[in-house]
């Protein structure tokens, strides 16, 4: 799903609204940058930052996506190895791949400037667990209350939770995972996580390519979904969480 162009476009649409409504600023750190779509989107706005991943393939993809954007550094690096602080930390479809997610949130809090934001996208609602969760190497799905408590424990009070899948993308995933027999599922979560950069569970020959080509036509759907359904994170299968480190003093 992360490589499905219409959904990816809507996630970037929501990112722009977070920036506008909550004053999210760079420089940024993107953890688990994958193909570099988010970092490239921010770089095109003139943001500076760092994009990291532990997959060689992901770093190579991201470096190509960010070619010509000298303000963004791409590195093969783990979160624990990052030094310095940032105004914004972004983790999209990453936290669910980390066994010690509480430890990761504490590290993120250390990498944030006072008053800085963390923007997280995670699979939501445990009852939505399907075979594609295993394909991508997920450890878990999240609830609003559970992630809110985890963020608070890390010193990152939550500001907002927005669903970005209900009803259209949620219904598409429900139908797809019922109709398609699951492929051979990996037993190694780390290998599955690395492969998730290029693996697309939503792979229907012909249909997938056609849907990707229609991505620019989805803007009316994005506007309607944002206006009507973003405040229903209990209904879809993924949501955003925005939190902020308290200002100094």
Annotated model-derived regions:
Residues 1-88, 92, 103-105, 163, ...:
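Conserved N-terminal segment of class I S-adenosyl-L-methionine
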Residues 98-102, 122:
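A structural helix-start
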Residues 156-167:
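Conserved S-adenosyl-L-methionine
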Residues 172-219:
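C-terminal helical/coil "lid" or tail adjacent to the Rossmann-like core of SAM-dependent
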Residues 93-97:
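A short His-aromatic
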Residues 49, 118-119:
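A short hydrophobic/small-residue beta-strand
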């Amino acid at each position: 799903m992360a490589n499905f162009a219409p959904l990816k476009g809507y996630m970037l649409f929501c990112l722009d609204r977070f920036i506008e409504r909550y004053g999210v600023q760079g420089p940024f750190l993107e953890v688990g940058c994958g193909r570099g779509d988010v970092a490239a989107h921010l770089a095109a706005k003139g943001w500076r930052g760092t994009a990291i991943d532990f997959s060689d393939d992901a770093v190579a993809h991201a470096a190509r996506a960010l070619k010509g954007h000298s303000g963004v550094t791409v590195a093969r690096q783990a979160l624990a190895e990052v030094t310095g602080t940032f105004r914004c930390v972004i983790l999209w479809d990453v936290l669910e791949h980390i066994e010690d997610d509480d430890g990761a949130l504490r590290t993120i809090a250390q990498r944030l400037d006072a008053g800085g934001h963390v923007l997280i996208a995670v699979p939501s609602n445990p009852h939505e667990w399907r075979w594609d969760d295993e394909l991508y190497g997920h450890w878990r799905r999240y609830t609003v209350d559970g992630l809110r408590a985890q963020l608070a424990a890390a010193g990152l009070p939550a500001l907002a939770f927005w669903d970005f899948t209900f009803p259209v993308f949620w219904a598409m995933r429900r139908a797809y995972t019922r109709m398609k027999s699951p492929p051979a599922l990996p037993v190694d979560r780390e290998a599955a996580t690395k492969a998730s950069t290029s693996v697309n569970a939503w792979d229907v020959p012909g249909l997938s390519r056609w849907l990707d080509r229609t991505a620019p036509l989805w803007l009316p759907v994005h506007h309607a979904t944002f206006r009507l359904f973003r405040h229903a994170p209990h209904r879809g299968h993924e949501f955003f969480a925005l939190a902020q480190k308290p200002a100094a003093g």
